[in-house]
């Protein structure tokens, strides 16, 4: 829900234009007050207001007006295999210009760069580009290429598109798309043929907008534009209908250590583009009885589609996709079901080709736990903790799409962390927004609470943890099955014992007990192997090699010719 921020005036926030010395704007903190722009990697960074996009989206009607994600039960999403082309328009407002140096070059690097050079606005702090993120998540089966245009300057002030009221129903994202395209097409960069952006079809799959200044979702006033994705129904590009739009802000509300304003982190753009691929938000929607501010109700920073878009100073190294999300998109991921007593060793993470494990409810195949090894590598390099991540999944019986609301039923989340320390804290709960002293320094209590979520709790700094067992007797929140109709909880009768994490090698190990009611029988040692078979383009084709036609397949990360 938008907060009415005491008549914040955009002109008072932004006076940097046309001055010899760049004047930095104020940003909005978690309590709705103005604060000085904090320095990157300082404890004050965590004070910036970072709001879920659903705070805005849920206040709008579920119509096909481009202002909601609930656009259809069977929408056609952006293709997520092969190479696709997406136009990006850099948009300035009448009263708000770009602040970063060389904006076109900066956002070409932001979206497509293979390296992140310092262009004067902390660009090098992004771990990689948006395209590199999706290449990594898809094991190189998906390669989005972004064509950057602009900047173009619109005739209206930012407030015209960002709105003013607390309900959020006066934002005009579709008008922003329409006006941006009109300005582009009247410029020297006018697109002559949009076929390249139809990616084999007859409709432009998605238009991406980067708008100047702050976003309301990350430090901006209630008059700024909110990062979002939705239906672009009614908009066209060179005679081609546009299916989706995504948009995000230029800035993230921080300054570099030498005082320069910083370009945004790639996290929000990765999150928004993932909606155009069909993935839903994982956090609870504000329109539900749950709202945001509930502990142990979702994934928080452990999922890009939750708070993970803001990992590392506001999203400069966003959290990788979970195994669940990779499977939803049909991207290569090895998930093996645990169905007997065994000793499990997980030497590598799924990002490095390792195995994730599934424990299935014997009474409901749509309900299960997923187990992943989170290591300090790749897009997890700046994560808050490492070790065994356990999360509870309870899928709806129908197909997942971008408007699916997994976590709107309080106490019965559809996808939520099983925290080693007993608390997966909500970033939106007031009691979690404060600071705590660690080694003589004030740190974010919320971030410190995240450090205890992964087993065995090695990285917790709030308390010394070594949680070596997860079972009905050694219970943690979300470690249970749901009774029919979400009428209560049932014991799992499963157990993970002797959980370890080797901080040198990054190896996770544990003993799995399949049925605790029958006592502990022999433990069969199980190394991380895979039987899942994929085509060269990343399509999963089952586990029976003999049943497949002649061709080249990928099994366990290796090419096999039949």
Name each region found by the language model.
Residues 27, 359-361, 532-535:
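A short beta-strand micro-motif
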Residues 206-385, 394-396:
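Extracellular hydrolytic enzyme modules, especially secreted metalloproteases
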Residues 351-355, 492, 547:
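Residues that act as N-cap/strand-start positions at coil-to-secondary-structure junctions
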Residues 371, 498, 538:
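Hydrophobic, well-ordered secondary-structure elements that form the walls
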Residues 378-390, 547-557:
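Short, surface-exposed, low-complexity cationic segments
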Residues 518-562:
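C-terminal outer-membrane/trafficking sorting elements
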């Amino acid at each position: 829900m938008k907060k009415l921020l005491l008549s914040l005036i955009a002109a008072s926030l932004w006076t940097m234009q046309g001055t010899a010395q760049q004047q930095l704007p104020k940003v909005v903190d978690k309590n709705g007050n103005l604060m000085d722009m904090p320095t990157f990697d300082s404890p004050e960074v965590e004070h910036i207001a970072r709001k879920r996009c659903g705070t805005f989206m849920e206040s709008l009607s579920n119509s096909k007006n481009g202002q909601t994600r609930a656009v259809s039960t069977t929408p056609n999403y952006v293709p997520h295999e092969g190479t696709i082309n997406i136009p990006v328009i850099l948009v300035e407002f009448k009263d708000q210009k770009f602040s970063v140096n060389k904006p076109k070059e900066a956002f070409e690097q932001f979206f497509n760069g293979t390296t992140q050079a310092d262009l004067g606005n902390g660009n090098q702090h992004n771990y990689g580009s948006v395209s590199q993120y999706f290449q990594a998540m898809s094991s190189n089966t998906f390669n989005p290429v972004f064509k950057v245009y602009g900047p173009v300057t619109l005739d209206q002030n930012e407030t015209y598109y960002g709105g003013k009221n607390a309900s959020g129903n006066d934002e005009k994202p579709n008008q922003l798309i329409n006006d941006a395209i009109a300005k582009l097409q009247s410029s020297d960069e006018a697109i002559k043929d949009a076929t390249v952006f139809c990616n084999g079809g007859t409709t432009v799959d998605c238009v991406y907008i980067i708008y100047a200044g702050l976003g309301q979702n990350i430090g901006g006033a209630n008059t700024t534009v909110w990062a979002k994705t939705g239906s672009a129904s009614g908009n066209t590009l060179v005679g081609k209908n546009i299916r989706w739009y995504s948009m995000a802000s230029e800035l993230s509300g921080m300054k570099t250590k030498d005082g320069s304003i910083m370009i945004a982190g790639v996290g929000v753009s990765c999150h928004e583009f993932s909606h155009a691929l069909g993935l839903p938000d994982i956090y609870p929607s504000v329109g539900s009885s749950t709202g945001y501010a509930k502990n142990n109700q979702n994934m928080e920073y452990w999922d890009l589609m939750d708070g993970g878009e803001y990992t590392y100073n506001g999203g400069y190294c966003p959290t990788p996709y979970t195994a669940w999300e990779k499977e939803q998109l049909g991207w290569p991921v090895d998930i093996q079901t645990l169905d007997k007593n065994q000793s499990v060793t997980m030497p590598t993470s799924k990002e490095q080709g390792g195995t994730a494990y599934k424990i299935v409810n014997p009474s409901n195949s749509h309900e299960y736990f997923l187990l992943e090894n989170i290591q300090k590598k790749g897009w997890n390099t700046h994560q808050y903790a490492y070790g065994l991540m356990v999360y509870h999944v309870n899928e709806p019986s129908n197909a997942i799409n971008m408007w699916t609301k997994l976590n709107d039923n309080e106490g019965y989340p559809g996808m939520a962390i099983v925290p080693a320390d007993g608390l997966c804290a909500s970033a939106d709960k007031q009691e979690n927004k404060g600071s705590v002293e660690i080694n003589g320094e004030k740190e974010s209590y919320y971030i410190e609470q995240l450090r205890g979520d992964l087993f065995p709790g090695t990285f917790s700094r709030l308390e010394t943890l070594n949680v070596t067992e997860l079972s009905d007797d050694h219970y943690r929140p979300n470690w249970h099955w749901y009774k029919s109709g979400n009428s209560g909880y049932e014991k799992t009768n499963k157990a993970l014992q002797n959980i370890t994490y080797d901080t040198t090698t990054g190896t996770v190990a544990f003993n799995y007990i399949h049925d605790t009611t029958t006592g502990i029988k022999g433990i069969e040692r199980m190394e991380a192997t895979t039987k899942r078979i994929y085509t060269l383009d990343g399509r999963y084709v089952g586990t029976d090699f003999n049943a497949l036609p002649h061709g080249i397949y990928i099994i366990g990360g290796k090419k096999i010719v039949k």
